[in-house]
Amino acid sequence: MLRTCDITHIKNNYEAIIWKGERDCSTISTKYPNSAIFYKKRFIMLTPELGFAHSYNQQVKPLYTFCEKQRHLKNRKPLTILPSLSHKLQEMKFLPASDKSFESQYTEFLESFKILYREPLFLQIDGFIKDFRKWIKGEFNDFGDTRKIQLEPFQKNILIHVIFFIAVTKLPALANRVINYLTHVFDIEFVNESTLNTLKQKTNVFLVPRRHGKTWFIVPIISFLLKNIEGISIGYVAHQKHVSHFVMKEVEFKCRRMFPEKTITCLDNVITIDHQNIKSTALFASCYNTHQSIRGQSFNLLIVDESHFIKKDAFSTILGFLPQASTKILFISSTNSGNHSTSFLMKLNNSPFEMLSVVSYVCEDHAHMLNERGNATACSCYRLHKPKFISINAEVKKTANLFLEGAFIHEIMGGATCNVINDVLITEQGQTEFEFFRYSTINKNLIPFLGKDLYVYLDPAYTGNRRASGTGIAAIGTYLDQYIVYGMEHYFLESLMTSSDTAIAECAAHMILSILDLHPFFTEVKIIIEGNSNQASAVKIACIIKENITANKSIQVTFFHTPDQNQIAQPFYLLGKEKKLAVEFFISNFNSGNIKASQELISFTIKITYDPVEYALEQIRNIHQISVNNYITYSAKKQACSDDLIIAIIMAIYVCSGNSSASFREI
């Protein structure tokens, strides 16, 4: 017989164990925010953090996102608030609500909100995510290697697809709440309805180049699902028996090593982990397996590895799981091969359901270049990047094609049979972002993050012929890891009677002084004057620019110096073979959205009726490759359109990005 005090003590300890997950996961404030509201019921919303408030707060995305993140944080860090804001907040007084029923409504709402954090399956999903995070950090490694694991985007994509689908099918009543939690955990912002529908799909296909860890990544997914999700049934199908056997043994080994406290059995190609009331199982089979079949099974997750090489008879059996509402089928395979019978999944590219994800080193616009140009091994738009552990060069290409014609494009690069003859280097997305998304560089909130050095590149031209070259001038600064265009000029001499050196220098100085007037935070102006045409004129231009700036502004002015024939440093820059590297660097950053224009951009020589950014875009669109005897160079000249301005912008960004501070000196 137990005493009353003992019963109470045991009950409290039992409840503490049962709801431990709730205390770990839920950080919802239970303090009632008592404030009066004076609007109609249809305009009222109720949240744990704000209490009763006006529904327009749902449209204030930063506020709503902040509340959701705070809701799921396990260890809240103290927030830093500006003293002025804190003082103003303390001055605000809220009238208490006159209706006492509001507090009881809030309490009931909060209690219903906590249901998610008490749900056993939610705690299982949260445990899966915690274990995966520990594995990524290297905490499950017993051999002293604590290096973090860096996942590729396609691996993160697979992980998100798996856990989202399980959450939606296992907890349909709380699906939206679970999804809000998972978007926070995976740090996915701006998730729209279309993205969620894609994640909820029953079937997804991932085509990835070889040697990228497709099968390697499947092992921890199966292991942690078996350990955390009670009653889950997983199926794994490989194209060959030895592959499925290897994966099974890897899963068994990892489970026994990482979860020694669990009861793990491996019998008849099925791994089982015993939980308190139910078992979690994973079945491993191959399309040639006569002893273990997936027929008649019921899976929550079915993974089909190297799907392109699965026997057609076995494939029809796999497709039989499509009508099963609670089954997620993941097809994972090498990207492509030259044989149409082993590349049939590429047909899903035209599917309206967005079920196909393809990883490739080359985009569709430039796939043809790998065949046309002998040493080409990368996408010329430089939008797609290969991992550091993958080494691809001309020797790899030649060797692969010697063994098997077309093997490089199909087996290594992940390309598909492509008839596209487009050779566009600049993407539409990059053009649109450059044209419409511009920073206000006089905004006080942005200024602390802007670079304090202004780089000016000047490419002088000594002609008044507007059909020929003009003088291109570009002023560039930095914002974190991005580049901002502060000013641009495309100057043509009015006549050959004009003193060209003086006119060009005054044009550049006028632009620089205007930029400094608007942006007084600059501490140094670094000027690069191209001297390929006339070195003597370049030196004279440098002297005139310095005289003009120092007469009007108290700021340090330095020039890029190059040794002349007598090894004496002169204030000019000789453009050489680095032009190719500079253009490639520009294309990569432009297509990645790292180059922006200032809203307060300065330009005196481009017509008032013409937007300078649109003017620059016309030249940017003209950038194209020129291949002569397997040597690749770039040009933006087309018909009557010159490339002076864009070359100045490209070189200014290239010099700005490099470690060339030692080359800048005063004169």
UniProtKB/Swiss-Prot annotation:
Motif stretch (Walker A motif): 208-215
Q: Where in the cell is it found?
A: Host nucleus
Per the UniProt entry, the Enzyme Commission number(s) are 3.1.-.-
Q: Which UniProt keywords apply?
A: DNA-binding, Host nucleus, Hydrolase, Viral genome packaging, Viral release from host cell
**UniProt GO MF annotations:** DNA binding; hydrolase activity
Q: Does the keyword Hydrolase apply?
A: yes
- How would you classify this enzyme at the top EC level? hydrolase
What does the record give as the function of this protein?
Answer: Component of the molecular motor that translocates viral genomic DNA in empty capsid during DNA packaging. Forms a tripartite terminase complex together with TRM1 and TRM2 in the host cytoplasm. Once the complex reaches the host nucleus, it interacts with the capsid portal vertex. This portal forms a ring in which genomic DNA is translocated into the capsid. TRM3 carries an RNase H-like nuclease activity that plays an important role for the cleavage of concatemeric viral DNA into unit length genomes.
Name used for this protein in its record: Tripartite terminase subunit 3
Q: Which species is this UniProt entry from?
A: Human herpesvirus 6A (strain Uganda-1102) (HHV-6 variant A)
UniProt lists the gene as: TRM3
